Each structure stands twice: as C-alpha cells, then as structure tokens.
C-alpha cells in the first residue's frame, strides 16, 4: 500500500497543498521552519489521528482556523482506497474511508502501517518502558486482529481497578474487575511475548549489519514475576496496591530490555549509534510485517542527515531501498539525499509552508 496523493489544508503552517507522490522515495527539502516536517506530520496524523510533535490540537491547526483537513489516496495491489481525517479545535475527529463517515482512527492505522524515525525518536531506547511497549504493541496490532480490542478493554479495566483501590478494604471487593482483567492481561502478554520472539531474528540480523561492533540482546519482560500466575500476583499485592492506589504489576508495566555487550544501550552507544539502532529496529519491524502479511510500511524520516556520517547514511538508504516500501525523507539540503534519488523518486521544495516539485 502506498500513498499516491496527499491533500493538506490548514495543518501547521501549510494553508493548502496537493501532492502527487512517488511509490518509492519522496524527498522534502527546505530550511528549518519551512514546513517540511509538517508534511511528514500530516502523513503521520492521517494514519494515527494525532500529531507526533504535539498532543495539543490547537498547535496543529493553522493559526486562526477552526480545523485541519487531510485527504489521501492509497494504492494497493488490487484497489485504491480514499481516506480522510478532519479534526477541530475541540478535538472532535471525523474519519472518512471511501466516501463514508463514521469510521475509527484504528481503521486508518491498519490501512497505513508506518514507521517514524525522528531526532526525538531516541526515547525508544533511552526513554521509559512505555516507548518500548508501544514498539511491541505496534507489531501486535498489525499481526493480531483481536489485539486492539483486548488492549482497549485492558486500559479501561485498569482505570476502573485503580479507582476501586481508593475505596475497597478487602481483596474480595476487587474480584469482579480481576475476573475480567486477568485473562486479558495474560492474552496480551502472550501476544507480546510471541511477537518479540518472532521478530528477534530480524532485529539481530539488522543490528548486526548496522552495528557489527556490538553484541545486542533483547529481553521481553511481561510486567510480573516469571512462572507466577497473574491472579496470584494481584491478590498477593492487594495491600501494597491499595496503599499506592494503582496496580503495580501487569502488562502495563512490561518492557523490552535492549543491551549492548551486556549493558543498557543508553549507557554504551553514542548518539549516532543510537540512531542507527533505532533505524535498525524500525526496519526490522517493517520487514517482519512484510514477511508475515505481505504488507509494506510507509517510512517517515525527519532530518535524515542528523547524527549520521556519509557511510551510515548510505547504509540506511540501501536498506530502505531494499524494502521496496514508500519512503518520505526530510532534509535541509538536497545534497544530503541526492545519492538516494533515482528515476522514480520525487523531490519537493518546501518554503514557508509552500510546497513545489
């Protein structure tokens, strides 16, 4: 699936844009603040319902406008799909697919699997466990049809359980929530464990190519003790949870621990090496999706040249080309991306929110 056309209205500093896109590489070149990252963010938002630079909707809608509008056309092997997203200052969204309203953002996410690589993306490696849970959950979402519903129900039940912890005095009063929570937690943890095991070889192979000087290991931690039933953990920790007023163990505490030569990667790798590792993990995830389902990711890469020397940029470019996926790359100068260009690529110039090709 590739995005063949993108229409943007009143998004960030872009008043209006209508872009015909390449199914291969698309380059966005312009000075800092020109709006090139806003194009990437518009694509991301079309597939996620939210921006990646700000959760405040008022900062995403163009100044003095009431809403932004995004439309796209997705070309699959057999058919074309029209998609659209409108979001106003109150945060209300309208999703349209093939001319009909009433769709969910999750449907857009399923139609547009994408990998985002930005200068802020180091949080996957040096941020808290929630960023690595999100990495695993992306894979589970695209590989397990029941994951999104189970994950949504888990979040709801945990919120209700945490509220109940402020009021109950005996564990028996929590059993109605735990009766629903326990099977969901175990299923989600099983999916995450299976996904992390399935993608392990892809991550190891890609990391070996990108960072041959290190031995990288990946370890899934489910969020409670090994070989202990979740029901037992919840009951045993009731008094502690009640004092904390939240559930201290469970899939919401899971992590994917990543080590280089036995030490945490954030303590061992340079910024350039961390970026390579981040790219390697995103590539591995996209390649795993293609192998398992035949679907390809869109890759969004902001500030391609930062942290990478010429050799490493060349390595990343060659691996991206090998995926045969659609790729969007922003750069300050065309010199940073010209070597990646071929007869099927498109080069866009961005200046003060105006986009030309």
Curated annotation (Swiss-Prot):
One of its GO terms (molecular function) is single-stranded DNA binding. It holds the Pfam family SMC_N. Disulfide bonds: none annotated. Keywords: ATP-binding, Cytoplasm, DNA damage, DNA repair, DNA replication, DNA-binding, Nucleotide-binding, SOS response. GO terms for biological process: DNA replication; DNA synthesis involved in DNA repair; double-strand break repair; SOS response. The keyword Lipid metabolism does not apply. InterPro entries: DNA-binding_RecF (IPR001238), DNA-binding_RecF_CS (IPR018078), P-loop_NTPase (IPR027417), RecF/RecN/SMC_N (IPR003395), RecF_2 (IPR042174). ATP binds at residues 30-37. Its main location: cytoplasm. It is found in: Cytoplasm. One of its GO terms (cellular component) is cytoplasm. The RecF protein is involved in DNA metabolism; it is required for DNA replication and normal SOS inducibility. RecF binds preferentially to single-stranded, linear DNA. It also seems to bind ATP. Belongs to the RecF family. This is DNA replication and repair protein RecF. It comes from Escherichia coli O7:K1 (strain IAI39 / ExPEC).
């Amino acid at each position: 699936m590739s995005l063949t056309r993108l229409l943007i209205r009143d998004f960030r500093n872009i008043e209006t844009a209508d872009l015909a896109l390449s199914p291969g590489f698309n380059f966005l070149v312009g000075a800092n603040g020109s709006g090139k990252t806003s194009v990437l963010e518009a694509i991301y938002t079309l597939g996620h319902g939210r921006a990646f630079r700000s959760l405040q909707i008022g900062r995403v809608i163009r100044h003095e406008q009431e809403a932004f509008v995004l439309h796209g056309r997705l070309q699959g092997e057999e058919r074309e799909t029209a998609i659209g997203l409108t979001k106003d200052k109150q945060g209300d969204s309208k999703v349209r697919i093939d001319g009909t309203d009433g769709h969910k953002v999750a449907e857009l996410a399923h139609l547009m699997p994408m990998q985002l690589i930005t200068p802020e993306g180091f949080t996957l490696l040096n941020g808290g466990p929630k960023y690595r849970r999100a990495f695993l959950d992306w894979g589970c979402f695209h590989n397990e049809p029941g994951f999104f519903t189970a994950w949504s129900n888990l979040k709801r039940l945990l919120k209700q359980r945490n509220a109940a912890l402020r009021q109950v005095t005996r564990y028996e009063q929590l059993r109605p929530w735990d009766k629903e929570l326990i099977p969901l937690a175990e299923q989600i943890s099983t999916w995450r464990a299976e996904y992390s095991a399935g993608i392990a070889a892809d991550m190891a192979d890609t990391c070996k190519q990108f960072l041959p000087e290190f031995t990288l290991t990946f370890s899934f931690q489910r969020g409670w003790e090994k070989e202990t039933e979740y029901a037992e953990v919840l009951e045993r920790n009731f008094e502690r949870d009640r004092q904390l007023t939240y559930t201290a163990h469970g899939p919401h505490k899971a992590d994917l621990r990543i080590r280089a030569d036995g030490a945490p990667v954030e303590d061992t790798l340079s910024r350039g090496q961390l970026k390579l590792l981040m790219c390697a993990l995103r590539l591995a995830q996209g390649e795993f999706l293609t192998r398992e389902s035949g679907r390809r990711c869109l890759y969004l890469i902001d500030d391609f040249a930062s942290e990478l020397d010429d050799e490493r940029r060349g390595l990343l470019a060659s691996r991206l080309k090998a995926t045969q996926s659609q790729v969007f790359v922003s750069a300050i100068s065309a010199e940073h991306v010209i070597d990646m260009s071929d007869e099927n690529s498109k080069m866009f110039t961005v200046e003060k929110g105006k986009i030309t090709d």
